[in-house]
Regions:
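PLP-dependent amino-acid enzyme catalytic core
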Residues: 1-190
């Protein structure tokens, strides 16, 4: 779904003479998304871990670079963890191979992060700044959405709930103050 939407937007921009702004494979976009990492450290100066969903990689790359630079400037360290759906995990494969790798994706409820190939710009930044990337299953994502709704009264789309899914499923065993970035509230009705 994401690839189709991306191509449709590029085609539309070309036909209409509009400006196409890439959603993640653009340094300016990545830097803009990095402000999320800065805000986290501004508000929680003792945070030790940040968990972020990874699709194309823009948000994760921006958060990782900005948070690590700010923490270092303050004489601290912060670890950044990325999470992908096991149905669309190009970063896991690409990081293992050390190069951009396109993977086959299968349908996932986390369609907002269902990309088949990492962005070139974010991949280089993630390779250097993300401490670990894990995957979560469809059932783990669904459980996280339910937990967020029942306990936190938050409607979070599947793509944004993967970080909580990783924690609940025990994919990340972290010590210290941890922040999970919850992004997106786009939920299709049941």
């Amino acid at each position: 779904v994401f690839a189709q939407t991306l191509h449709a937007a590029q085609d539309y921009a070309a036909k209409k003479g509009a400006i196409f702004i890439p959603p993640y494979d653009n340094l300016d976009v990545v830097l803009g998304q990095g402000t999320v990492g800065l805000e986290i450290l501004d508000q929680l100066d003792d945070v030790q871990n940040i968990i972020v969903a990874i699709g194309g990689g823009g948000l994760a790359a921006g958060v990782a670079v900005a948070a690590k630079l700010k923490a270092k400037a303050n004489g601290r360290k912060v670890k950044i963890y990325g999470v992908q759906s096991e149905h669309a995990a190009p970063y896991v494969t690409s990081l293992k191979k050390g190069k951009l790798t396109e993977v086959a994706i299968t349908p996932t409820i986390a369609d907002g992060i269902a990309v088949s190939k990492p962005g070139r710009v974010p991949f280089e930044l993630i390779k250097k700044n993300i401490d670990k990337v894990v995957t979560v299953s469809e059932n783990e994502i669904a459980k996280a959405i339910l937990v967020l709704l029942e306990r936190a009264k938050q409607v979070v789309e599947p793509a944004g709930a993967v970080g909580v899914a990783a924690l609940i499923a025990g994919k990340l065993k972290l010590k210290g103050k941890t922040v999970v970035i919850l992004s997106g509230g786009n939920m299709d009705p049941l």
